[in-house]
C-alpha cells in the first residue's frame, strides 16, 4: 500500500477536508503492514472503497424563531459504511459542523462500531444549528424541521442516529416525536439516547465516560498499574466528562480539573459527588462556561483561556472535542511523566500530539477504542427495543464492562510491539480487519 499516493488522490478529491484527511491518514499508516499481507484486499480495492462514504445527504432546514423570522440551517447525514450492520452514529448540532468533520466522525465511527463486535455500521450527521441562546420552542421547531427530511433515510434496519454535541435527551425527544408523527409508527430502535420512560437505556448518558474509565482501568492493569489513588486531569464538563468523572471517582481516582471554552478549573481537593453533579447544572445553564464552578466551590481556581494539560496529573483524559490537545500540550503532559493518556473525545489529539505520545512509548489510547462505550450502550438500547425489554443498571453496566474489556483485548492483540502496546495501531487494525472481511464477503458494492 502506498499511503502517500492514496492520500494525494484523496486530497485532490476532497480539498480542504482537514479533519477527514487526518483521520484517514492515521488509519492507513496503522494498517499498511497488515493490508500488504492480504492481496485479496488490494484486488477488491477495499481501501479505495472504505475511505468513501456510501451515501451523503445534504438538505436545508428552515424554521421560524420566536420573533417570527425565518431561519435556514444546513442538515447532513453521512452514511459511511454498512458492511456489518445499519449505519449508526450521532447527530451533532453546532456552528462548527461541516462535511469534513462529519466525514471524519463517520469514518471513525465505522471502526469504533466494529470494535464493539455489535452489528452496527458507521454514520454521522448533524447541522450548523446552535442550541445556545435558543428557547425550548425554537429548539423543538428546528428539530421537527430537521427530522422532516431526515426521516426519509433512517430506520431500525437502515440508519439509527443518536445524540452528540448539542443533541441531548431534549433534542432526541423532539426528533423522535416528529419521526413518530411522520411515520405513524413507534420504532424505538430508530433513535437511541431516548428517555428511560419511552424506550431509552439506563446508563446511556454516563456510558461514554464509564466505558472510557473501564478501558483505562484495563490499560493500567495490563501494565501493572492501579487506578486507585491516582489523579486525573480531564477536559470538558458535559455528559462525557461527567460520566468519566463519576466512574473515575468510583474507581478510587481523584479528578482535579474540568474545562470549558472559557478556560479550566483546578480543584486540588478533587471532585466529590456534589461537584460532579454540579457539572450537569453548568451544562444545563446553556452558558457553556465553567467559571461559575469557582464561585460555587471556594478553594478551586479558574484559569481563563487556558487548558488543563499544564497541570500535573497521573492520567490525562481529553473529553471535550476533536483536536483539543495539540503538540505543545503533549510536550507539557510528557514533561509531567504521566502514567496514561486516553482520548475520550473523538480524535481529541492532533496527529502531532499522537505521534509524540507513541514516539515516547507513552501509554496512550485513541478515541475510537476509549469512547466506544457510548455507541456500545446505544447498541444495547437497540437490542432492548427489539426485544421489548428493559435491563437494569447492573445488567447494562456488566455488558458495557464486558464490551470494553473485549475492545482492550483486541487492541493488545493487534498493537503489541515488544513490551509496548501501540493502542492506536491495535484499534485501527482490529476495526479495519472486521469491516474489510465483511466488505470482501459481500462483493463489489
PLM region spans:
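Structured beta-strand/loop patches that form or line metal/cofactor-binding pockets in enzymes
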Residues: 40-69
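Glycine/serine-rich phosphate-binding loop and adjoining beta1-alpha1 elements at the start
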Residues: 94, 113-228
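Glycine-rich phosphate/diphosphate-binding loop of Rossmann-like nucleotide-binding domains
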Residues: 195, 200-312
Amino acid at each position: 500500500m502506498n499511503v502517500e499516493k492514496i492520500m494525494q488522490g484523496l486530497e485532490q478529491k476532497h480539498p480542504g477536508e482537514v479533519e477527514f484527511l487526518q483521520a484517514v491518514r492515521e488509519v492507513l499508516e496503522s494498517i499498511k503492514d497488515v493490508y500488504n499481507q492480504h492481496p485479496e484486499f488490494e484486488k477488491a480495492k477495499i481501501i479505495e472503497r472504505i475511505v468513501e462514504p456510501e451515501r451523503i445527504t445534504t438538505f436545508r432546514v428552515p424554521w421560524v424563531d420566536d420573533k417570527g423570522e425565518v431561519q435556514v440551517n444546513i442538515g447532513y447525514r453521512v452514511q459511511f459504511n454498512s458492511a456489518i450492520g445499519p449505519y449508526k452514529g450521532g447527530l451533532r448540532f453546532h456552528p462548527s459542523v461541516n462535511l469534513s468533520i462529519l466525514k471524519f466522525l463517520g469514518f471513525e465511527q465505522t471502526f469504533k462500531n466494529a470494535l464493539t463486535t455489535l452489528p452496527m455500521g458507521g454514520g454521522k450527521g448533524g447541522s450548523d444549528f446552535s442550541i445556545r441562546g435558543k428557547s425550548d420552542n425554537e429548539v423543538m421547531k428546528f428539530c421537527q424541521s430537521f427530522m422532516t427530511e431526515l426521516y426519509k433515510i433512517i430506520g431500525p434496519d437502515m440508519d439509527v442516529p443518536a445524540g452528540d454535541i448539542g443533541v441531548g435527551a431534549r433534542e432526541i425527544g423532539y426528533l423522535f416525536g416528529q419521526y413518530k408523527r411522520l411515520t405513524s409508527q413507534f420504532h424505538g430502535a430508530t433513535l437511541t439516547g431516548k428517555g428511560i420512560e419511552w424506550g431509552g437505556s439506563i446508563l446511556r448518558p454516563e456510558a461514554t465516560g464509564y466505558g472510557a474509565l473501564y478501558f483505562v482501568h484495563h490499560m493500567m492493569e495490563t501494565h501493572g498499574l492501579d487506578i486507585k489513588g491516582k489523579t486525573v486531569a480531564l477536559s470538558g464538563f458535559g455528559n462525557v466528562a461527567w460520566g468519566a468523572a463519576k466512574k473515575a471517582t468510583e474507581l478510587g481516582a481523584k479528578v482535579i480539573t474540568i474545562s470549558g471554552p472559557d478556560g479550566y478549573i483546578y480543584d486540588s481537593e478533587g471532585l466529590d459527588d456534589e461537584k460532579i453533579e454540579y457539572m450537569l447544572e453548568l451544562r444545563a445553564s446553556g452558558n457553556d462556561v465553567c467559571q461559575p464552578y469557582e464561585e460555587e466551590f471556594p478553594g478551586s481556581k479558574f484559569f481563563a483561556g487556558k487548558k488543563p494539560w499544564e497541570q500535573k496529573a497521573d492520567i490525562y483524559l481529553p473529553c471535550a472535542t476533536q483536536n483539543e490537545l495539540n503538540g505543545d500540550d503533549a510536550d507539557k503532559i510528557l514533561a509531567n511523566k504521566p502514567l496514561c493518556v486516553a482520548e475520550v473525545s473523538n480524535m481529541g489529539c492532533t496527529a502531532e500530539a499522537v505521534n509524540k505520545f507513541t514516539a515516547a512509548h507513552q501509554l496512550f489510547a485513541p478515541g475510537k477504542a476509549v469512547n466506544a462505550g457510548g455507541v456500545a450502550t446505544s447498541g444495547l438500547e437497540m437490542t432492548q427495543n427489539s426485544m421489548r425489554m428493559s435491563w437494569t443498571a447492573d445488567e447494562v453496566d456488566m455488558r458495557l464492562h464486558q464490551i470494553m474489556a473485549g475492545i482492550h483485548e483486541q487492541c493488545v492483540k493487534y498493537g503489541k510491539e515488544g513490551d509496548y502496546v501501540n493502542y492506536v495501531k491495535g484499534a485501527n487494525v482490529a476495526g479495519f480487519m472486521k469491516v474489510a472481511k465483511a466488505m470482501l464477503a459481500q462483493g463489489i458494492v
